[in-house]
């Protein structure tokens, strides 16, 4: 569940530094994504993934540019307001049972792809962005998981060269720590698969909203 990653990010930032922690976390995310795709490989709406990826890559470039201009506090405020607005759209749809009238517009997916690419590059924090997007699109549980698994695998693998060559955040030392964490990541993946099976559709949506 991508939104739960935000529980870990602050502690990693305190331990390794805000920017440096993104390079420590990224290989672990890639490992988890590979496990998720291995299990859910046949469940994906590729049309939705394809709508998100082009502007997600643009979000990478925006993040690299803005990183030099905006302080960390500014990023947190920007992300907070963006997520609050997106959550309001989703909650309105849930309470009043109305379809999001923007969901079929080309710019809606493009906007969330851009936000996802930007927030994942800055702080590995795109989980809530994608959660809000997919829930507002009223994706069912397994479709939600399949899209998330493939989108984040592709996006996180594409981030690796940026983290190595642009920000120098991934080193042999940090990667050795990632390898030590591999068994724990595997256990977490198995628990996540089990947890998903226990949730009925409506309870799953409520759980995602809560962790987001």
What residue spans do the PLM features occupy?
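Small-residue-rich hydrophobic segments that form or flank transmembrane alpha-helices
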Residues: 1-50, 112-113, 127-185
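A helix-boundary/kink motif common to multi-pass secondary transporters
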Residues: 17-18, 71, 140, 200-204
């Amino acid at each position: 569940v991508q939104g739960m990653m935000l529980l870990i990010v602050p502690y990693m930032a305190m331990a390794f530094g805000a920017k440096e922690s993104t390079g420590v976390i990224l290989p672990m995310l890639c490992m988890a994504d590979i496990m998720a795709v291995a299990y859910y490989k046949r469940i994906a709406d590729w049309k939705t993934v394809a709508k998100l990826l082009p502007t997600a890559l643009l979000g990478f470039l925006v993040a690299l540019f803005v990183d030099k201009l905006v302080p960390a506090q500014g990023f947190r405020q920007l992300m907070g307001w963006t997520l609050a607005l997106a959550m309001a759209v989703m909650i309105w749809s849930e309470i009043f049972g109305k379809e999001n009238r923007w969901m079929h517009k080309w710019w809606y997916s493009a906007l969330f792809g851009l936000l996802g690419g930007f927030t994942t590059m800055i702080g590995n924090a795109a989980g809530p962005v994608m959660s809000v997007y997919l829930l507002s699109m009223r994706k069912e549980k397994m479709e939600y998981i399949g899209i998330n698994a493939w989108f984040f695998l592709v996006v996180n693998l594409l981030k690796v060269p940026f983290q190595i060559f642009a920000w120098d955040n991934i080193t042999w030392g940090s990667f050795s720590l990632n390898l030590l964490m591999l068994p724990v990541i595997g256990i977490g993946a198995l628990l996540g698969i089990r947890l998903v099976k226990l949730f009925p559709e409506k309870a799953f949506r409520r759980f995602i909203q809560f962790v987001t």
